[in-house]
Amino acid sequence: DMESNETDVRWYPLFSLLYTLKGRCDSLKDGFPDGEVAEIDDTVRSVLTGLSDCFTYGLLDRDPDSLLRVFRKVVELDESYQPLESEVLENNDSAQGCALSWFCQLLNRGLVGAVVDILARYENITDYYSYSLFVSSDGAPLLKTILADLAPLTFRLPTTISLPSPTVSPPPSR
C-alpha cells in the first residue's frame, strides 16, 4: 500500500549507504587479498540481510526509531571511513595495512552491534545462531558488552523472525 511504499522510500538512504560501503570494500580487495576486506564485505552483507528481514516482516511499524539509530551509526562510520579510504589508497606501505585493519574493527563493531540492537528490540525472535561469524576476536569484547544489555538475546542473531498474527495488536502509544 501507499504507506509501506513511503516507508521503503524513507529508509532507502540507509540501504544506499550500505551498498556504497560494500562497493568500497570491493574496490579495496585487489590491494588486500588476505581476509581483511572479505571480513568487511561479510559484515556489510549481514547488515543488509538483517535490514531486509526487518522490512519483509513489517518490523518497522513496531519500532521505526531503531532503524533511525542504525542509519545515524552507519552515516558516522561512512564519514569516518572517507578520509581513511584516501589514506589507504595513497600510501603503499605498512601503515596501509594498519589503517585498513583498524577500519575492519570499527565497521564490524558498529554495524553488527547496531543490527543486534535493532533485532533484539522485537519480542518474537526465534531460531538463533552464533554471531561469531560476523565479528573478529578484536571486536568481541565490545559486542559482548552490547549483547549483555540485550538479554535474553545472548550472543545470538536471528535467522528467522516469527510474528504472531495476522491480527497483531498495535504497540501502546507513547
How would you name each of these model-derived features?
Residues 1-2, 174:
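Intrinsically disordered, low-complexity Ser/Thr-rich segments densely containing proline-directed motifs
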Residues 3-100, 106-115, 120-125:
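Extended cytosolic scaffolds built from alpha-helical repeats
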Residues 83-172:
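Alpha-helical bundle/repeat cores within regulatory domains of eukaryotic proteins
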